[in-house]
């Protein structure tokens, strides 16, 4: 089953007009913005990195091929008071040449998740990003060394060859999301990193300052234009050891906007299982243990103060578990700063629209 791409290859514009949307995206409410980045509405809710390398190894056929990965999840627009939208995700794997004439399929996974976060962080430095409001497109410029250095700084070291392979996977894997339950079903199809332009060794020898560039997903550009992103603690995210702990952190950072001692965040096991795609064990007890480990990592990093859980039973059978998460004061302060930034940015953009600044 092939997933088609919506448009032909593009090249980045030579220049774009300065715009308030990109300026706001790169402006953080903090004395030190180096540890901050942005969560992206919808994009970060898509469980596109959920298939582990171990699962991929078990799923490949004798020709090293993988099927299209299919998963359902729910997405609730944080800026709208509406019911959750049921979504169907398809991920077409990338076919990577691992040795001359030999190709192996890969789904995007943990390494690609981390590199995406690094690229978004690099993009937030205006020296390395370009954003067109009218064209709804965003470009990032980078070198392999920039990515490697940032990953090492954050305790997630990868070799140059590993980074190059991840970029190839991101530039080939196709993500399709179908939004269901509507009179007219909407479908979004895109690469994780479009129009990737690479620097070869000969290119580097001729121009050591030459850079790679790629186009970020249209959903990211749309979020920048509409101010539906949120400031969050990028340093904390990158310090977390597992995909599930990072999933919790980003979900809390984007959705838990009323964080406080009197307002715990509640989430069910079934919701975690459906929306993260990261509970891979056949036994529920093993998956519950993974959740406990992930949540305790958030306690260690002052995201959560404490957690409690309540089993929902049908007779002797556990049918679901409700987790009640209490925010740490440090996280509450971060959420308040993110809320203040969002209010300020919306006010600023409304003034731009009225022509008052």
What is the predicted role of each segment?
Residues 1-357:
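Charged, alpha-helix-forming regions
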């Amino acid at each position: 089953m092939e997933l088609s791409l919506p448009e032909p290859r593009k090249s980045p514009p030579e220049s774009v007009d300065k715009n308030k949307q990109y300026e706001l995206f790169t402006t953080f409410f903090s004395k030190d913005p180096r540890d901050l980045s942005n969560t992206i509405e919808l994009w970060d809710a898509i469980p596109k990195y959920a298939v582990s390398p171990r699962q991929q190894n078990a799923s490949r056929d004798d020709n090293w091929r993988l099927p299209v990965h299919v998963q359902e999840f729910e997405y609730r627009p944080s800026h709208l008071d509406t019911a959750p939208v049921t979504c169907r995700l398809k991920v077409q794997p990338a076919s990577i040449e691992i040795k001359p004439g030999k190709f192996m399929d890969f789904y995007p996974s943990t390494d690609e998740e981390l590199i995406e976060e690094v690229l978004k962080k690099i993009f937030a430095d205006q020296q390395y990003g370009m954003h067109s409001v009218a064209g709804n497109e965003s470009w990032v410029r980078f070198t392999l060394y920039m990515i490697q250095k940032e990953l090492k700084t954050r305790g997630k070291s990868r070799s140059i060859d590993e980074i190059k392979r991840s970029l190839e996977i991101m530039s080939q894997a196709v993500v399709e999301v179908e939004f269901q339950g509507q009179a007219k079903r909407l479908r979004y199809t895109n690469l994780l990193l479009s129009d990737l332009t690479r620097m070869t060794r000969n290119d580097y020898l001729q121009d050591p300052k030459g850079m790679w560039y790629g186009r970020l997903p249209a959903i990211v550009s749309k979020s920048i234009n509409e101010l539906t992103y949120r400031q969050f603690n990028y340093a904390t995210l990158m310090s977390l050891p597992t995909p599930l702990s990072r999933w919790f952190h980003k979900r809390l950072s984007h959705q838990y906007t009323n964080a406080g001692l009197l307002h715990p965040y509640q989430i069910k096991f079934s919701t975690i299982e459906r929306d993260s795609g990261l509970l891979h064990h056949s036994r529920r007890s093993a998956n519950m243990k993974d959740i406990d480990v992930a949540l305790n990592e958030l306690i260690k990093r002052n995201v959560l103060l404490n957690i409690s859980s309540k089993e929902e039973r049908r007779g002797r059978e556990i049918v679901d578990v409700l987790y009640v998460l209490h925010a740490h004061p440090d996280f509450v302060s971060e959420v308040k700063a993110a809320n203040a930034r969002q209010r300020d940015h919306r006010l600023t953009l409304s003034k731009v629209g009225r022509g008052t600044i």
